[in-house]
Amino acid sequence: MSQISYKDAGVDIDAGNSFVENIKPLVKATFTPHVLGGIGSFAGAYELPTGYKEPVMLAATDGVGTKLKLAIDSGNHSTVGIDLVAMCVNDLICNFGTPSFFLDYYATGKLDVSAATSVVAGIAEGCKQAECSLIGGETAEMPGMYSEDDYDLAGFAVGVAEKSELDRVSLVKEGDVLIALPSSGFHSNGFSLVRKVLFEKLRMKFDDDFNGRPLIDVLLEPTRIYVKLFKALKENIVAMAHITGGGIVENLPRVLPDHLYAEVQKASIRPLPIFELLKEHVDETEMYRAFNMGVGMVLVVRPENVDAVLKGSDGYLIGTVKTGEKCVKLS
């Protein structure tokens, strides 16, 4: 009677070991002196940074959504790891946390060592941009749960904040100014609608030219990471809103008290050309709910600090905070 191996059941331990060897130098390149120990332990260890009066640990988790489908179908896995880090650390800094370390979860039907290595290379690059360390991860090969070519990602960012700086909402006042930090594209939201319009309705192809670039490169442009800008501008920022799913209209109110609303001048927003293409086929109200419309982060700033923020960033004015029921008014 023949014996059945784990590999026969669809799980290749040797491939997993090969993958780990591939990513070791990528992971180590993100380490700072705060990382204790090496790779291969049961848990990652990170020495808490000093200099805080009342340090508070912050954690954020997210994924990349159906942008992964474009990476899988195009065979370009090099940027979605950056997206994964960005979606987590950009949330973290909105609570005035400084990212310390990152962990990832990679699940697939059949481990493609080359593709997985490319993904982790992107995660490592994202960690470098966010100035945090990749100290752990899990690779799950699950035949029957996913098709062989599919994979999914989840990320987990942990950072430190000063306890006294956590409550940003109560600091927002009437007359505060709204500054938009540009996005690099769709970031990691709205791709189900993007795919519906571009590939089902318009029958576009990955290699179609769009503004001098292959369309797929425009769509897979990685999410911008705002950590370094946050660190540079922190003293001049009252609050920050990461513009993700729900767009400006649903994310900006998250940093407003109940008695204040944000008046945003729609004409001041600078959508990228790819958004203009979508606008021809999607209602404008839906556009502002599904996409960031070229705005990756909104900063709430005191009027006297506006010049310093504008000089220290590529941001631009989009509105003000006014008294009234909490909402966003696009005018």
Residue ranges and their predicted role:
Residues 110, 188, 272:
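Loop/helix-junction capping segments adjacent to catalytic residues or to phosphate/diphosphate-binding pockets
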Residues 2-33:
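N-terminal amphipathic/basic leader segments beginning at the initiator methionine
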